[in-house]
Amino acid sequence: MQTHKAKRVEIIIEAPMERRLTEALLRAGVTGFTVLPVMGGSGRSGHWTREGQVGRAGMVAVICLIRPDRLDALLDAAFTVVERHIGVVSITEAEVLRAERF
């Protein structure tokens, strides 16, 4: 089966910023994403949980699979939201089966 190269972008951000982030992604031409709750983690500031340091709202993970040529627009849009808030952006290589969906 033929696969097609894609980029998987995962953005972990404070839940109250989800709408602002997803609206920025849509304006940048991102056609789809998935939003998942983040239960907890550990990072530069130490261990945290949904009920702890981050507050009741918690964090969310916004995951996008996109064509490589759309990456810069997505990152520019994401950075306008993430730069002033708690957040992590990661990019990994991916392969998809139906390129026309991305």
Ranges and model annotations:
Residues 1-102:
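Positively charged, small/polar-rich N-terminal and surface patches that mediate targeting and assembly
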